[in-house]
């Protein structure tokens, strides 16, 4: 936002989506839940690269308006005149997941320290937004590898789930 407002070109060095560019799953973001972690009306698992997301932000009217969020609200006039330069990747194919790129993993947050956490995030990250659930065992030691709740007995839950004979 600050770059666009001050006529400074934004340069994005595109990088692979760790889950690949073909995996798309989940409903698109409901506009009522826009926040600094979810602005785009794309599925929860979207398959887009950071460059594609940046282009979407630049080209989609209204997408950079998030009431109450700081640092990302940009007027339509500023968005339209902002300069964006995306440097494309070489050698990446949409079918490639992170391990196939041969690139070194650099943690994207304190909780996403490795590719295992990337795989688990879509499955467990949303569940932890539902109240007292945790996405680590214990705390941040193994984030996004499962969920826990202080009032749920894991053995009893496992027994009840097995009794349902669910496929998979």
Q: Which positions does each model-derived feature cover?
A:
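Glycine-rich, aromatic-lined ligand/substrate-binding cores of catalytic
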Residues: 92-94, 98-168
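Glycine-rich, charge-decorated loop segments at or immediately adjacent to ligand/cofactor-binding or catalytic sites
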Residues: 11-33
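Conserved anion/nucleotide-ligand pocket segment
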Residues: 34-121
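Residue-level preference for alpha-helix termini and adjacent loops
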Residues: 18, 23, 35, 39-47, ...
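A short helix->loop->beta-strand "cap" motif at the edges of active sites that frequently abuts
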Residues: 5-9
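Active-site-proximal beta-strand/loop segments in catalytic clefts of secreted hydrolases
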Residues: 13-16, 89-90, 147-149
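Cleft-lining beta-strand/loop regions that shape enzyme active-site pockets
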Residues: 1
């Amino acid at each position: 936002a600050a770059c666009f407002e001050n006529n400074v070109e934004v340069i994005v060095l595109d990088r692979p989506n760790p889950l690949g560019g073909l995996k798309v799953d989940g409903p698109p973001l409901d506009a009522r839940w826009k926040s600094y972690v979810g602005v785009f009306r794309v599925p929860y698992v979207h398959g887009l690269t950071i460059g594609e997301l940046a282009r979407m932000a630049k080209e989609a009217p209204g997408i950079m308006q998030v009431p109450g969020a700081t640092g990302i609200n940009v007027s339509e006039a500023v968005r339209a005149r902002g300069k964006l330069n995306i440097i494309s990747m070489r050698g990446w194919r949409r079918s490639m997941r992170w391990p196939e790129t041969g690139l070194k993993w650099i943690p994207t947050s304190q909780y996403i320290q490795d590719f295992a956490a990337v795989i688990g995030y879509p499955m467990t990250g949303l569940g932890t937004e539902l109240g007292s659930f945790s996405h680590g065992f214990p705390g941040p030691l193994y984030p996004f590898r499962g969920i826990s709740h202080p009032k749920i007995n894991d053995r009893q839950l496992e027994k009840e789930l097995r009794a349902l004979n669910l496929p998979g």
